[in-house]
Amino acid sequence: MDIKTLKGFKDYLPKDSLIRIHIVRQIFSVLNSYNFDLIDTPVLEYSELLLKKSGDEAEKQIYRFKDNGGRDVSMRFDLTVPFARFIATNASNLKFPFRRSQFGKVFRGENSQKGRYREFMQFDFDIVGEDSFRGDAEILSVVYYGLEEIFLNFIEGINKKFIIHYSHLGILNSFFEKLGIKEKSLFILRNIDKIDKIGVDKVKEALLLKIEKEVVDSILNLVNLQGTFKEKIQALKSILGDNESVKRVEDVFQHLSLLKIQDSFNLNLKISRGLDYYTGIVFESEVFDSNMGSVCSGGRYDNLVSSFSSSIQKISGVGGSFGVDRIKDIIDLEKFSYVKIFVTKARSKVLIVNLDSALQDYYYELATRFRNHDYSKVKNISCEVYFKNKNGKNIKEQIEYALSKEIRFLVFVGQEEYKENKMKVRDLTKKEELLLSFEESINVIKCSEKLLCTPF
């Protein structure tokens, strides 16, 4: 009897399992600070659902079989498509925008190697029901703080630097349309996504099978755009003119600059992702000197949820996925003698009420200050800004949103409070409201903490 594990599958000894669960814990800490809610979905789904938006490459890797009842079923290859099905199934029971987090195993029948397995753990996070550059930037900031928490604050002696590459499929599709090859966009995107894996020469060879050389050269020149962020944007504007997707990327970068984390991001038009459901911003993250590929990837998907049911209107979403096992493999490359053990503290939830269009940037700066007020320890204040949309939301609806998420504290900042560098803090439990400075508000919120059970 052959008792070894299948190729691409592995056992985890106690030390390995400890590292994995601490990676999950660190990611959970960051996601919880943004008020993401934890969910779960089945490992098995109907094949028709998973294949609907998987794309040709993913379809080849799906574990598919007939169950004992003769049903055509498949093991999930990611957590995003099952999540879209989850939204379509449970939309009436959810409050939007919905912030989801989920960790679990996924399965892909691909060539296994270091950092790439057939069974592996992912930790996903999404914001659904919100289509704005703020939502895109919020997800990218989660990537940054998640990687910072893992590689700077997790293992004693590990100080891994990382870069987050991002792009926008709207920019590429606009360029393809200008070249008159819009109908070949999916074919081109799938090949562009392989440049860093197989090299530009092989990608060029594949593109030349269906596209003229002059056009292929134009495409490759665009995706290899060099320079600073400002120089790249200027070049794109000179090529595409007044373009909505270019403006979106500018706005996202401005938000990241607001948080002072923009230097860890790189506008890289080679990033296109290999899955058919992405429609907007896309990203991958790279840890220097690891040679492991992306450790956190994702993007915006505008049509995925509605594709599961004709009765569901368009629900836009944006999200990402941390590769837990790939991150563990990078940690294994290091020599370390001590794993920091963090105690997950009770969380105090805060919602910044969106009152004034002129104070949007300030609200997000304030949310970051709440989350990071005691950054040397595990985060213990969860905070989010209620998204401002075109129709506007009155205070009553924002309070109902807070109550539905069991958020205890509301923060109100209008022009008067902003000028005085104060805020109104309303405790929904005690039903009292105080005018406080930031430090005073921290004390009020922290003093009200109670022990809280967490999954870890």
Swiss-Prot record:
E.C. number: 6.1.1.21
GO terms classed as biological process: histidyl-tRNA aminoacylation
Family annotation (InterPro entries): aa-tRNA-synth_II (IPR006195), aa-tRNA-synth_II/BPL/LPL (IPR045864), Anticodon-bd (IPR004154), Anticodon-bd_dom_sf (IPR036621), His-tRNA-ligase (IPR015807), HisRS-like_core (IPR041715), HisRS/HisZ (IPR004516), HisRS_anticodon (IPR033656)
Top-level taxonomic group: Bacteria
Keyword annotations of the record: Aminoacyl-tRNA synthetase, ATP-binding, Cytoplasm, Ligase, Nucleotide-binding, Protein biosynthesis
Molecular functions per Gene Ontology: ATP binding; histidine-tRNA ligase activity
CDD domains, per the entry: HisRS-like_core, HisRS_anticodon
Reaction(s) catalysed by this chain's protein: tRNA(His) + L-histidine + ATP = L-histidyl-tRNA(His) + AMP + diphosphate + H(+)
Localization (cell): Cytoplasm
UniProt name for this protein: Histidine--tRNA ligase
Species whose genome carries this gene: Borreliella afzelii (strain PKo)
Top-level taxonomy: Bacteria, Pseudomonadati, Spirochaetota, Spirochaetia, Spirochaetales
